[in-house]
UniProtKB/Swiss-Prot annotation:
Its EC number is 4.2.3.1. Pathway: Amino-acid biosynthesis; L-threonine biosynthesis; L-threonine from L-aspartate: step 5/5. InterPro entries: Ser/Thr_deHydtase_PyrdxlP-BS, Thr_synth_N, Thr_synth_N_sf, Thr_synthase-like, Threonine_Synthase, TrpB-like_PALP, TrpB-like_PALP_sf. It comes from Eremothecium gossypii (strain ATCC 10895 / CBS 109.51 / FGSC 9923 / NRRL Y-1056). The keyword Amino-acid biosynthesis applies. Catalyzes the gamma-elimination of phosphate from L-phosphohomoserine and the beta-addition of water to produce L-threonine. The gene is THR4. This is Threonine synthase.
Length: 512
């Protein structure tokens, strides 16, 4: 299948190839790339042919719809997929822990933390790193050293994206990676994972500010045409379409495991910040996977929950620090892709260009007025697919304790605070629905050892709890390694660009 990509803010007919969309990351107009067509699969394909496939085979079947064979031939795509998941600690890649609290509730936990950095983002970023390497090897084949293409990857992280990006790109030829994170606002283990990597192509910057400050810097860099031209800036944040694509697979995979390969009633509960993870679930639903509802679980930074309730997308004045810091955001970057879809369906009569104009107006209004609202019928259309729950700090810790006390498969199961936000939301859905025919799949987005402070606060009063039992040896050893960090007490984008350029000069990659 041939597939092209367009910008969420474009009113033109211009499109990009998969390679262009992945390497560029963010469109020239500030929009996000998305596929022009979402394939729709027949029920027969899903439940007779796909239901019992391995994770890797499912990924292959899904990605073939979004990556044209002329861009990546099928044998080479399969090799990329196999290599991307070879470092995961589970043969299933994303195993589903079924009926965690007993058979009556049908509460299943999808463990997404079995990759090299113990976070769900490994599922996407191991694949993205190999994609970058594949495209660069092909582009640089048979060219002189002076003519080689070099990518400069720039990303912002609230914790797990940074380490997953670094582990996906470390040591890759012709790639330099610069990760910005808010100083003092990520967990010690997350910082250690990013800053103890010795590969020379990896650079970390601790910024005095919030995650949104870091993200705004990155977005400003991406729309700077001159800086892009000089340094071939590329993205690994959740704005990169390849990340969404890689995450679609585990919605199919876990659905089939929960229902034993049969059609069934399934709700997915997804801890949500930048909306990339749950957006992948929406694409799975649009492809034909019969998901009953996608439940957005937010913490106290609740722009998504407020939108679902009121139809107003409004940026708060400041970020609230919570026990689930990866979700401490003001603006949910990937939500723009969902808005484009519903603008096209509900307001633009299926016209891609008109949908782009509408989304562009909304985000201009957000930039100028910090808010915009949408028509009620568009909001109703979104509510048909989505529900939302807001979970505060108190209930986050209470959910960690609840699972620890009530888990049966296994007993004394420990979850991280982001997963706990999802579990709290799932339990509310279970209590509301009172229907044991529904399967509730709650996404476990990180290993609990990555968030020691919150887990210890929740569980330290239990006599049989010891954090040392939770901490994997690989993470324990990070504390003994030397850190490489550049501290930046300025959120001026020009300062950050100067630092990046200086490092590229020092590495002999850029000669001004």
């Amino acid at each position: 299948m041939s597939q092209v990509y367009r910008s969420t803010r474009s009113s033109s007919e211009d499109t990009k190839s998969f390679e262009e969309a992945v390497i560029q990351g963010l469109a020239e107009d500030g929009g996000l790339f998305l596929p022009a067509v979402i394939p729709r699969l027949r029920e027969e394909t899903l439940f007779e042919h796909w239901a019992h496939l391995s994770f890797q085979d499912l990924a292959m079947e899904i990605m073939k719809f979004y990556i044209a064979d002329w861009e990546i031939p099928a044998p080479e795509l399969r090799e990329l997929i196999e290599r991307s998941y070879s470092s995961f600690r589970s043969e299933e890649v994303t195993p589903l822990r079924k009926n965690v609290t007993g058979d009556d509730e049908n509460l299943h936990i999808l463990e997404l933390f079995h990759g090299p950095t113990y976070a769900f983002k490994d599922v996407a970023l191991q694949f993205v790193g190999n994609l970058f390497e594949y495209f660069l090897e092909r582009k640089n084949r048979d060219v002189s050293e002076e003519e080689r293409t070099h990518l400069t990857v720039v990303g912002a992280t609230s914790g797990d994206t940074g380490s997953a990006a670094i582990y996906g790109l470390r040591g890759k030829q012709d790639v330099s990676v610069f990760i910005l994170y808010p100083h003092g606002r990520i967990s010690p283990i997350q910082e250690e994972q990013m800053t103890t990597v010795e590969d020379e192509n990896v650079h970390t910057m601790a910024i005095e500010g919030s995650f949104d400050n870091c993200q705004d810097i990155v977005k400003s860099i991406f729309v700077d045409e001159e800086f892009n031209r000089k340094h071939n800036i590329a993205a690994v944040n959740s704005i990169n379409w390849a990340r969404i694509l890689a995450q679609i697979t585990y919605y199919f995979y876990s659905y089939f495991r929960a229902t034993d390969g049969q059609p069934g009633r399934v709700k997915f509960i997804v801890p949500s910040g930048n909306f990339g993870d749950i957006l992948a679930g929406f694409y799975a639903k649009q492809m034909g996977l019969p998901i009953e509802k996608l439940v957005i679980a937010t913490n106290e930074n609740d722009i998504l929950d407020r939108f679902l309730r009121e139809g107003v997308y409004e940026r708060s004045e400041d970020v609230t620090a919570t026990h689930s810091p990866a979700m401490d955001i003001l603006v949910s970057s990937n939500f723009e892709r969902l808005l484009w879809f519903f603008a096209r369906e509900q307001l633009a009569q299926g016209d891609d260009q008109e949908a782009g104009s509408i989304v562009n107006r909304w985000f201009e209004q957000l930039r100028e007025e910090r808010r915009f609202d949408v028509p009620e019928h568009l909001l109703d259309a979104i509510r048909y697919h989505f529900d939302s729950e807001r979970v505060d700090n108190y209930n986050t810790l209470a959910s960690i304790r609840h699972i620890y006390e009530h888990a049966q498969n296994p007993e004394r199961y420990v979850i991280d605070p982001h997963t706990a936000v999802g579990i709290c939301a799932a339990n509310r859905q279970i209590a509301h629905d009172q229907n044991n025919e529904i399967h509730y799949i709650s996404l476990a987005t990180a290993h609990p050892a990555k968030f020691a402070d919150a887990v210890n606060e929740a569980l330290s009063s239990y006599d049989d709890y010891n954090f040392d039992d939770v901490l994997p040896d690989r993470l324990r050893r990070l504390g003994d390694l030397e850190k490489r960090i550049k501290y930046v007490d300025n959120t001026d984008v020009d300062v950050i660009k100067s630092i990046i350029e200086e490092e590229l000069i020092n590495m002999g990659i850029y000669n001004p």
